[in-house]
Each structure stands twice: as structure tokens, then as C-alpha cells.
Amino acid sequence: MKLCVAFLLVLVILPSVIGGKPSERTLSGATRRGDRRMCLSLGQRCERHSNCCGYLCCFYDKCVVTAIGCGHY
């Protein structure tokens, strides 16, 4: 348990120690810019592969699961 807490503490503190800057694509950054795009779930209407969540592809205007990936459509 103590090891887990120590590991999480290191992950939280490490970026500030090494001078890491927060990414532009953080949730707070996206909210500030009004960029509130959300991915679409299985069966929802889409226009392109990037509209669909994770492993889903846009095929015939719907987000679907494919066996061969999105690049083949």
C-alpha cells in the first residue's frame, strides 16, 4: 500500500520537478478553447473515422467495429 502511494506521489510531483509543461490537449485546455468534441459510440451517425471512439470506424455513416481496421475503407 505504501509503495502504491509513493509511486502515485512521484507521478504527481515529477513533472513539476523536471519542468514539464502541461499539454495543450488537456481537458482544461480543451474547455477553455470551446473544443468539446466527444467521440461517437457504436451505431451512432458519423462522417469520418476520427468521429468514432477508439477502435470503432465510420462505415456507411455509422460507427462500427471492424476486424481489419479503419484504413481499409
Swiss-Prot record:
Transmembrane segments: none annotated. It is found in: Secreted. Expressed by the venom duct. Residues 21-35 form a propeptide. Residues 1-20 form the signal peptide. One of its GO terms (cellular component) is extracellular region. Keywords: Cleavage on pair of basic residues, Disulfide bond, Ion channel impairing toxin, Neurotoxin, Secreted, Signal, Toxin. InterPro entries: Conotoxin-I_CS (IPR013141). Disulfide bonds join 39-53, 46-58, 52-63, 57-70. GO terms for molecular function: ion channel regulator activity; toxin activity. The cysteine framework is XI (C-C-CC-CC-C-C). Belongs to the conotoxin I1 superfamily. This is Conotoxin Bt11.1.
